[in-house]
């Protein structure tokens, strides 16, 4: 794939801005959609996104726009990075401007609350029959601030057919941002969304000063839960041993830059979720995803005890100390049975 013009990036949060910078470093012109008019003006005038990626000087190849059509119309390749709770609205607004054969790379990690659809599932629902838009998914262990500093990073790009995935892989990969391809789109999306819920649990554990043993147990058993869910939905179990699975899970559960882990730490210290979120500018996707995972697991009959308890802490104000006791006193199991 050789895009005939600029590449569009829809969303100028920390990750969207960083991906725009990566693509600009590859030599492409980038049209970046910025929702906030004042931020758009700031990026144009100062070459910095002081709201979401402060301290990073942006490439002169990045052109900030407040009009969505300027970023979508006549673009062969689009990267979409908006919060999951507004994803459907933005995708729907893009449709009148999409090229019939455009490629959209989803870089949002989440599951829609009302429909329990992944982001590519939303595209399947909103795209009219006449458009042959190909939707891929980019996920993996990638803190935006580290990628913006050109720290070596590896991620997974999943699509429905290998030719398109490889084409996009060659367009976006750089000397510091390495992309591997996959054909397991649902597995990559489920892993990317679910790991944020486990990161909340790991943060609660850290906030309660439980130590490394507890964190290791949560990550390992959390991976088992994510794998059960993914396999039940048709994923390849090996996906969860890769970058989009255990790689992203490890990073989000242990890294100090993890917003979800940070929220979990404060929950573990006894703070209320509404007070924590009131102080945050950026989105911790795990908070909304905990609700989606709770209902999705119940609907398809998958046991996810850690995710279930995270849901109860956030949405039912359950005491984390009670959660720990209940998790540790569950019926004893054989470790490697997929149903447990």
UniProtKB/Swiss-Prot annotation:
**In the UniProt record, which is one GO cellular component term?**
cytosol
Source domain of life: Bacteria
Give, as in the UniProt entry, the pathway in which the protein acts.
Membrane lipid metabolism; glycerophospholipid metabolism
Q: Name one GO biological process term.
A: glycerol-3-phosphate catabolic process
Which residues participate in sn-glycerol 3-phosphate binding?
109, 140, 142, 195, 248, 258-260
A single Pfam family, by name?
Answer: NAD_Gly3P_dh_C
Cellular location of this protein? Cytoplasm
Q: Which InterPro entries match?
A: 6-PGluconate_DH-like_C_sf, 6PGD_dom2, G3P_DH_NAD-dep, G3P_DH_NAD-dep_C, G3P_DH_NAD-dep_N, NAD(P)-bd_dom_sf
Q: What class of enzyme is it?
A: oxidoreductase
The signal peptide stretch is none
Question: In the UniProt entry, which residues are flagged as the active site?
Answer: 195
- Protein EC: 1.1.1.94
Q: What are the binding positions for NADPH in this chain?
A: 14-15, 109, 144, 259, 283, 285
Q: Which SUPFAM superfamilies match?
A: 6-phosphogluconate dehydrogenase C-terminal domain-like, NAD(P)-binding Rossmann-fold domains
Per its record, the protein catalyses: sn-glycerol 3-phosphate + NAD(+) = dihydroxyacetone phosphate + NADH + H(+); sn-glycerol 3-phosphate + NADP(+) = dihydroxyacetone phosphate + NADPH + H(+)
Q: What does this protein do?
A: Catalyzes the reduction of the glycolytic intermediate dihydroxyacetone phosphate (DHAP) to sn-glycerol 3-phosphate (G3P), the key precursor for phospholipid synthesis.
Recorded family membership: Belongs to the NAD-dependent glycerol-3-phosphate dehydrogenase family.
- NCBIfam families reported in the protein's UniProt record: PRK00094.1-2, PRK00094.1-4
Q: What is this protein called?
A: Glycerol-3-phosphate dehydrogenase [NAD(P)+]
Organism (species): Syntrophobacter fumaroxidans (strain DSM 10017 / MPOB)
From the broadest rank down, the organism's phylogenetic lineage runs:
Bacteria, Pseudomonadati, Thermodesulfobacteriota, Syntrophobacteria, Syntrophobacterales
